[in-house]
Amino acid sequence: METDTLLLWVLLLWVPGSTGDIVLTQSPASLAVSLGQRATISCRASKSVNTYGNSFMZWYZZKPGZPPKLLIYRASNLZSGIPARFSGSGSRTBFTLTIBPVZABDVATYFCZZSBZBPWTFGSGTKLEIKR
């Protein structure tokens, strides 16, 4: 999937916490992690987002005043230019975004998104902060 096409769809359909046929439950809502430690964010779909052997789950990072940035596509594939500190895993209904180690620049809100069925839907977001 080309990044430009995906970004256009995301910008057109960006409705955090929206609901459709598939509901995404993201947790935790907020997370404070020390620099250098691991952050783990979970996303559970109300039904499987697997089709033809692919898991249609994406992860985005959003910072104030910036468009969402694609980190992970199809559950575990790292988008070009994204550091290997970011990784995705999971299948069917249960997915995880891991950031290890966390850096100061990772302060943001992270969203899961399913692209298996129209309308594409998003989780409600996880706000990552640095523990002082």
Swiss-Prot record:
Region listing for Complementarity-determining-3, in residue ranges: 113-121
SUPFAM superfamilies cross-referenced by the UniProt entry: Immunoglobulin (SSF48726)
Disulfide linkage: 43-112
Coiled-coil spans in chain: none
Signal sequence annotation: 1-20
CDD domains: IgV_L_kappa
Alphabetized SMART domains for the sequence: IG, IGv
Ranges for region Complementarity-determining-2: 74-80
GO CC annotations on file: immunoglobulin complex
Region Framework-4: start-end pairs: 122-131
Keyword match Disulfide bond: yes
UniProt region (Framework-2), positions on chain: 59-73
Domain of life assignment: Eukaryota
Presence of the UniProt keyword Signal in the record: yes
Pfam family, any one: V-set
Residue span of region Framework-1: 21-43
Region (Complementarity-determining-1): 44-58
InterPro entries: Ig-like_dom, Ig-like_dom_sf, Ig-like_fold, Ig_sub, Ig_V-set, IgV_Light_Chain
Biological processes annotated in GO: adaptive immune response; immune response
UniProt keyword annotations, A-Z: Adaptive immunity, Bence-Jones protein, Disulfide bond, Immunity, Immunoglobulin, Signal
Name of the protein described by the UniProt record: Ig kappa chain V-III region MOPC 321
Organism per entry: Mus musculus
Taxonomic path: Eukaryota, Metazoa, Chordata, Craniata, Vertebrata
